[in-house]
């Protein structure tokens, strides 16, 4: 498969509420160093030379996004977000198809502002050279336990376990098909790769940095602030 790519569209599903943060607003609108997490994330994606545009999925009743400068950025297109991640991604893919923006898309979590450009480079290379596409992932280093009712059942072999990260990059049309078919069948889709897995396809794993973590808990904010202060790409 060709490894030449002129540009890619980044999709950012940002319609979630982030209830585990126990904050007064969705976590993507919490601020780190004067900017919202969503602004950090989108600015990092747009700083990559091959990311030409962002399609961000936002809830229709979101009162915070219109106040951001992003709302006036011509490279950032807003679409209506859905109740689930897959619905938001499909909404973005519909926009991309209607405007014929790109054959390739990379989907990135709104709450992963610490992704490095070098990892995006590796992801693009990995996706372009694979029949299905690719995701960033990090090998599991900790001992893993399967539990039930607050007790350990057994230790899980970690040799072949990976933490799925984002971005995840695929051709737009096959991703739309995979997500649509999975949702029609009532399949639980937690990331884009899982839709392809359900169809019996195996996206490539591209080893990424472990500091590309998802902000989920209140204590994650300080860690993200540290990584962002160190990341001068």
Swiss-Prot record:
State the reactions this protein catalyses. 2-C-methyl-D-erythritol 4-phosphate + CTP + H(+) = 4-CDP-2-C-methyl-D-erythritol + diphosphate
Which CDD domains did the record assign? Answer: CDP-ME_synthetase
Keywords, A to Z, come to: Isoprene biosynthesis, Nucleotidyltransferase, Transferase
Biological processes, Gene Ontology terms: isopentenyl diphosphate biosynthetic process, methylerythritol 4-phosphate pathway
Q: Which GO terms describe its molecular function?
A: 2-C-methyl-D-erythritol 4-phosphate cytidylyltransferase activity
The UniProt site entry described as Positions MEP for the nucleophilic attack is assigned to 158, 214
The record's annotation in Pfam families points to: IspD (PF01128)
Q: What EC number(s) would the UniProt record show?
A: 2.7.7.60
Coiled-coil annotated residue ranges, if any = none
**Residues carrying the site annotation Transition state stabilizer:** 20, 27
Pathway membership, UniProt = Isoprenoid biosynthesis; isopentenyl diphosphate biosynthesis via DXP pathway; isopentenyl diphosphate from 1-deoxy-D-xylulose 5-phosphate: step 2/6
What domain of life does the UniProt record list for this protein's source? Answer: Bacteria
Family the UniProt entry places it in: Belongs to the IspD/TarI cytidylyltransferase family. IspD subfamily.
The record's HAMAP family line, in alphabetical order, gives: IspD
Protein task: Catalyzes the formation of 4-diphosphocytidyl-2-C-methyl-D-erythritol from CTP and 2-C-methyl-D-erythritol 4-phosphate (MEP).
NCBIfam families attached here?
ispD (TIGR00453)
Per its record, how is this protein called by name? Answer: 2-C-methyl-D-erythritol 4-phosphate cytidylyltransferase
Q: Which organism is it from?
A: Vibrio atlanticus (strain LGP32) (Vibrio splendidus (strain Mel32))
């Amino acid at each position: 498969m060709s490894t030449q790519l002129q540009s890619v569209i980044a999709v950012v599903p940002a319609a979630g509420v982030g209830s585990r943060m126990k904050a007064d607003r969705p976590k993507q609108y919490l601020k780190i160093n004067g900017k919202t997490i969503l602004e950090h994330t989108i600015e990092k994606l747009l700083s990559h030379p091959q990311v030409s545009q962002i399609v961000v999925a936002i809830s229709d009743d979101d009162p915070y996004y219109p106040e951001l400068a992003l709302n006036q950025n011509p490279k950032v297109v807003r679409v209506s977000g859905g109740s689930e991640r897959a619905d938001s991604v499909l909404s973005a893919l519909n926009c991309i198809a209607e405007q014929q923006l790109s054959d390739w898309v990379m989907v990135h979590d709104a709450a992963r502002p610490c992704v490095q450009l070098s990892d995006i480079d590796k992801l693009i290379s990995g996706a372009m050279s694979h029949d299905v596409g690719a995701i960033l992932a990090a090998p599991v280093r900790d001992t893993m336990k399967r539990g039930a009712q607050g007790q350990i059942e057994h230790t899980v072999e970690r040799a072949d376990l990976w933490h799925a990260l984002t971005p995840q990059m695929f051709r737009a049309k096959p991703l739309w098909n995979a997500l649509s078919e999975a949702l029609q069948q009532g399949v639980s889709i937690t990331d884009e790769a899982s839709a392809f897995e359900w169809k019996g396809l195996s996206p490539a794993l591209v080893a990424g940095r472990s500091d590309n973590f998802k902000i989920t808990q209140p204590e994650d904010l300080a860690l993200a602030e540290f990584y962002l202060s160190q990341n001068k790409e």
